[in-house]
Every structure is written in C-alpha cells, then in structure tokens.
Amino acid sequence: MSLTKQYFKYVSQNIFGLLGTSCYILADTYFISQASGTSGVALLNLCLPIYNFIFAIGSMLGLGAATRYAILRAQGDERSERYFSNALLWALVFALPFMLAGIFCPEVLLRFMGGDAEIVTLGVGYARIFLLFTPFFMCNYIVSAFVRNDGDPSLAMVATLCGSLFNVVFDYIFMFPMGLGLPGAALATAVSPVLSIAICSRHFFKKSSTVRLVRQLPSPKLLAQSCQLGVSGFVGEMSSGLTTTVFNLLLLRLAGNVAVAAYGVVANYALVATAIFNGVAQGAQPLVSRCYGKNDAAGARKLLLLGSGTALALAAALYAVLFGFTGPIVAVFNSENSALMAQYAFSGMRIYFLGYFFAGFNIVAAGYLGAVDRPAEASATSLSRGIVAIVACSLVLSALFGMNGVWAAFPASEAITACLTIFLLKRKN
C-alpha cells in the first residue's frame, strides 16, 4: 500500500474514533441541557477543563510512549517493549490525586473552577463520579495509542466508537428512565472508556501484536523519554482546558452565567472541531514516526504536506457548515429558549471558529514535530497556542472589545502561533 493510501486510511479511521469521543461530551451537554437548563450547561463547561487535564495527561503518556515505541521498533530496538507497561503504571500514579479529590472534596474543586453555590450544589455528584474513573480515561488513551501504532487503527476506531455509542445511549437511560439525573450522565461517561479498553485489548491476543506487558516498576527515566515526545499532546489538550477556564472567568465578569452557558455551546462544538484535527495529527503520527525511524525524510515531509492540506480543507468545510446553520446549531443546547444566550452563542460561534483555519495547521504541525523527535519545537508550538498567545490575546482583546474580543482571542492567537510554527518548520527543513 502506498504511503498516501496508508495516510488516508489511518487519518480517516482516527478522525472517526476521536469524533466519537467528542460526541459523547456533546451527548452529555444535550441531555444535561434538557434536564437542568442553562445551569447544567454552565456546570459542564466548568467541568470541561478538568476533563481536559485528565485527557492531557493520558495524551502525554499515551502518545509520547507510543511514539517512542514506534521509532524504536522501526529501528529494531528491543527497548520498545518497556514503554507500554511503564505508561500504564504512571497513569495509575497520576490518576490518584483526581480520585482522592473525587472522594473527599469535589465541591472545593468546583468552587476553584469558578462555580457559585447553585452550580456547586448541582454538580457535586457529577464531579465525584467522573473523577473516580480517572484511571480508565487515562489508560484508554494509552491503550488506543499503542494499538494504533502497532498497525491496527481499525480496532482503535471501533473501540472508541463503541464506547461513545454506549455513552450516548446510557446517558439517556441513566438520566431519564432510571431517574439518576446528572450523576447518571457522569456514570455513562465514566463507563465508556472501560468498554473501549476491553475492545482494544483484543489486539494483544493476536499473533501480529508486538506490544507486550512487561513486569516492571514505574521508571522515571522511561517516563521522561515518553513525556519528551508527548508534551505537545499534553499542551494541546490542556489548551482547551486553559482557554475554557480563562474565557469562563472573563465572561462571568462581563455578562454572568448566561455568557458562560453560551460559551458552553461554543466550547462543546469546538471539542468536535479539535477532535477532527487531532484525528489528522494522531492518524499521521505512526506513519511519520516510522518514516523517521527508517531515515525516510522525504516520506515524513510528504505526510506533513498531506496533513496540512487536509487540515485546511476540513477547516473550510467545517466553517461553511457552521456559517450556514449557526442558528439551528446553537438551538440544540438552548432548551430554555433563552434569547440572550442564543445571541451570545451565535456571534461567538462565527468569530471563534475562524481560528480553525490556523489551528488545524498548528495541531498537525505540532504532531509532526513530536513524531520526528523534535520535542522542543513541538512544545513551543503547543505552548504558544495553548498558553502564551491565547491568554495574552484574551486579556487584551476582551479589554478592548468586550465579549467579541473574548471570541476573537482564539483566531488571533492561532494566527500568531501559525507564524511561529512556519518559522520552526523552515528552520530545519
């Protein structure tokens, strides 16, 4: 199979898988909006940064260890076998603080994220349940990344889609027929990665599998080597959480809970968009790492060009759909028919999503830099879009233009980051 055909196979399957992951958060938002209105949407938006932090750690461990595994395996280095077990062990270590917070102080965490008394009371049960399942969220990321890098992207996609379908169906069953409310939504979301891991585990019993569990203690050295290549994934995931936190605080100050609920609508659709571009980056990563391990620089560059072109085409298609159907798209999560929330979300969607013309390229380029063992450049791109540029732009533009400035901060920061990314790519290429 040609490199181009392999690329489209891996990327398409990974996009579908990650779309499934983001769709279960959309399902949460929809059912919660039906059950609890704008307060429920505001609660979920305050919880999204916590989800992002959990997924960011899983991404750093999973993508970093799997990338290191793919490079060493292409070079015939037997040390590749140790990275899978090490990543799983460290996931359990990193998950422990989240589990303890879920048991002892979920209300403190919700207050820290900006929740008022109403939101905290509403969300304690929801937060407690999903925090207790943190190990499964992290391990799901790791298992899926290794299955994909071991030549089985189809199984990784099926596992993710099945987990997401379970979440959507049981969101409804737990919340409404069974009457569990918000804790029911959290339970459906929490069990979803357990099912995905179980399906992915089939791969390890195949004769073609080269991924093995190795009896070992957690190795800080292997962790550092993995995180070196996974830090861009960490920052990429964290960027959504940080953006959400900063925007929530700014919008609370500018217009209160209704503005936060409006951003909840924007942020949930943004998760879907980000999943599409992460699908391109993560789908190409095993092939790029394989080319790099075999010293095939031309093949790696070809994959970068394919990824960049795909990202631009997808951004154009995405914005065309969003621009044409902004009203109905916003209305899906506006169960109370709040005219003010609809107004805020309408303008927010059209301004915010311009950023994906740049963000798609930045995500693909950061993934490429990590896959070819250039962690410093990958981290610079991710840090710019995830922390430095987005915080600076949101503070400056919100002071100048109010709410429209908050929405414009995302495209402005991504445009700045794209300039930096092009410079970093040209510096060595």
Regions found by a protein language model. Give the residues of each.
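Short alpha-helical transmembrane segments in multi-pass integral membrane proteins
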Residues: 1-15, 69-133, 177-231, 288-355, ...
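Helix-loop interface residues and adjacent transmembrane-helix termini in multi-pass membrane transporters
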Residues: 26, 35-38, 72, 149-150, ...
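Alpha-helical transmembrane segments of multipass membrane proteins
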Residues: 26-30, 100, 142-146, 168-173, ...
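Hydrophobic transmembrane alpha-helices of multi-pass small-molecule transporters
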Residues: 53-56, 167-171, 197-201, 271-275, ...
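Short runs within selected transmembrane alpha-helices of multi-pass transporters and secretion channels
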Residues: 62, 129-148, 156-167, 185-200, ...
